[in-house]
């Protein structure tokens, strides 16, 4: 592993992919002796009839799958957990490798133990979900150091996380004051209400018309009092 100090992470992964393909071609099964099952007396040991293992439903709920897909399609940052990195590789080398192979690397956080040594684990934050998904598809399961270990990449997505609203959606403008503000429209009196109000008022009785004799009599009474 000390020879990896002079190599980049790109060279380590590239050489291991070629070596793993050659190992698969030459690893065919030979014509060795076959194993013979043990017999008890003249009969083979019979196994009890089993229906097979019980399959568990490991499928995620459709709501969670839809939420994860929606989060990956947005422009928000998405983290990827990487395990199996060579422990003599520095944090800057991890950043340079994924930035050149995938792009959009925002932050890289390499994990260290209490002695200050790398644990081979890192959290990489990508610019969006598409770049994070591309990194997982390309490098998940890639051999390291001649196939001694393999990279494991996992997306870190919280399906309960709500999408962040833009700043324009979260800020509301203050109401304008002064002449620019719209003035309230003045409405005239309601005719129906005015007519109903006038009808409810008691009508004043008009004084009866007086004759000339009544007027002369009132004049005579007025002068007599004086």
UniProtKB/Swiss-Prot annotation:
Keywords: Acetylation, Nucleus, Phosphoprotein, RNA-binding, Transcription, Transcription regulation. Residues 1-62, 173-226 are annotated as: Disordered. GO terms for molecular function: DNA/RNA hybrid binding; mRNA binding; RNA binding; RNA helicase inhibitor activity. The keyword Lipid biosynthesis does not apply. Residues 208-226 have a biased composition (Basic and acidic residues). It is found in: Nucleus. The modification N-acetylserine is found at residue 2. Residues 78-158 form the RRM domain. The modification Phosphoserine is found at residues 8, 100. InterPro entries: ALYREF_mRNA_export, Nucleotide-bd_a/b_plait_sf, RBD_domain_sf, RRM_dom, Yra1/Mlo3_RRM. The keyword Cytoplasm does not apply. Pfam families: RRM_1. GO terms for cellular component: nucleus; transcription export complex. Component of the transcription/export (TREX) complex, which is at least is formed of SUB2, TEX1 and YRA1 and the THO complex composed of HPR1, MFT1, THO2 and THP1. Interacts with RDS3 and YRA2. RNA-binding RNA annealing protein. May have a role in pre-mRNA metabolism. Component the TREX complex, which operates in coupling transcription elongation to mRNA export. PANTHER family: RNA AND EXPORT FACTOR BINDING PROTEIN, RNA ANNEALING PROTEIN YRA1. This is RNA annealing protein YRA1. It comes from Saccharomyces cerevisiae (strain ATCC 204508 / S288c).
